[in-house]
């Protein structure tokens, strides 16, 4: 299937266009130079043909959620959001030159680095959960690397708030890192499904492939979904990965959500225990504990306050389902 050409970059006062960074289903990302303060920035611009009230609300939700969360050291920083003269909404973000999605398939990442990344990204996810937000698309290509080598979680475009969802809520998802109950449309997303995605992501960074991907085999969507729903988690295949870590990852990807770690925080503690077992420096937990940081989630239409449950209501309402292929 041929990829579409990027849209025309908008004329943004105070910014100079440099080049295209990437294209997605609903938006393009461009590299601009901001004139004051002078710095490189990534600008995410919605496609004109998809802009309607529902999509505009979804984009506004992403901007608000990322602004609320981006003070976290492992969440991508958002600088501003606005609407271009041609009517397209845009988001100005910190520019990161690389993603883990580019690295993990090309080179074997050191075990210590993967454990540290896992703790940091899970800390970001735990912080989001405490503010009532699910990311719902945790995967290697959504982990960027800052100029200082720090991993940051990006793309809250299909994020949602805890408390009020229906299993029928259509969400964008990436099959290789999605929990079986999400693929089966039993839930739109839960804390437990985020734990699955965290485990699948850490596994991918270690193995150089997603957990149920078979090198040289049938990795089409149907085959992959079937293995995710029924097959056991295979070993990473790395001799330097201890049994304790294999067990942590297998537990995080248990078929039954109740058999997984109960939270991103519990997943963090398990990774830190492996660091201790290997006599590695312990990656610090980065979870905000103060009352302000634990305030209720952003609520655009006052329908999505935090509830007692762990299911979600999409901030965008109903958006069409799109399933990414096995490679991303």
Language model features: what each stretch is:
Residues 80-82:
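A short, aromatic-enriched beta-strand patch in the conserved N-lobe beta-sheet
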Residues 260:
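Conserved HRD-motif arginine in the catalytic loop of eukaryotic-like protein kinases
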Residues 121-133:
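Protein kinase catalytic-loop region centered on the HRD/HxD motif
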Residues 45-69:
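AlphaC helix of the eukaryotic protein kinase fold
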Residues 18-24, 29:
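Protein kinase glycine-rich loop
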Residues 117-118:
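Activation segment signature within eukaryotic-like protein kinase domains
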Residues 85-99, 103:
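Conserved short submotifs of the Hanks-type protein kinase catalytic core
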């Amino acid at each position: 299937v041929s990829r579409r050409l990027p849209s025309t970059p908008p004329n943004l006062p105070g910014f100079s266009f440099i080049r295209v960074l990437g294209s997605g289903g609903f938006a393009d990302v461009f590299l601009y130079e901001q004139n004051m303060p002078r710095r490189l920035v990534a600008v995410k611009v919605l496609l004109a043909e998809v802009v309607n009230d529902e999509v505009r609300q979804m984009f506004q939700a992403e901007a608000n959620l990322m602004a609320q969360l981006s003070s976290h050291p492992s969440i991508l920083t958002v600088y501003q959001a606005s609407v271009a003269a041609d009517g397209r909404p845009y988001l100005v973000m910190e520019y990161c030159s690389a993603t883990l999605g580019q690295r993990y398939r090309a080179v074997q990442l050191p075990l210590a680095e993967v454990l540290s990344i896992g703790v940091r990204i899970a800390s970001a996810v735990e912080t989001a959960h405490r503010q009532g937000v699910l990311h719902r698309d945790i995967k290697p290509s959504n982990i960027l690397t800052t100029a200082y080598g720090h991993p940051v979680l990006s793309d809250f475009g299909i994020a949602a708030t805890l408390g009020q969802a229906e299993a029928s809520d259509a969400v964008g998802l990436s099959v290789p890192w999605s929990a079986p109950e999400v693929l089966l449309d039993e839930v739109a997303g839960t804390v437990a499904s985020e734990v699955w995605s965290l485990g699948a992501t850490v596994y991918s960074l270690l193995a150089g492939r997603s957990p149920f991907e078979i090198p040289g085999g049938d990795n089409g969507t149907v085959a992959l979904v079937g293995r995710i729903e029924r097959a056991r988690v295979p070993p990473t295949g790395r001799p330097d990965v201890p049994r304790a870590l294999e067990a942590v990852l297998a537990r995080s990807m248990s078929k039954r959500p109740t058999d997984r770690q109960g939270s991103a925080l519990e997943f963090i503690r398990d990774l830190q225990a492996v660091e201790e077992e290997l006599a590695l420096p312990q990656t610090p937990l980065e979870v905000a504990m103060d009352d302000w940081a634990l305030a209720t989630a952003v609520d655009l239409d006052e329908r999505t306050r935090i509830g007692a449950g762990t299911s979600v209501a999409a901030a965008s309402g109903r958006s069409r389902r799109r399933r990414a292929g096995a490679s991303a």
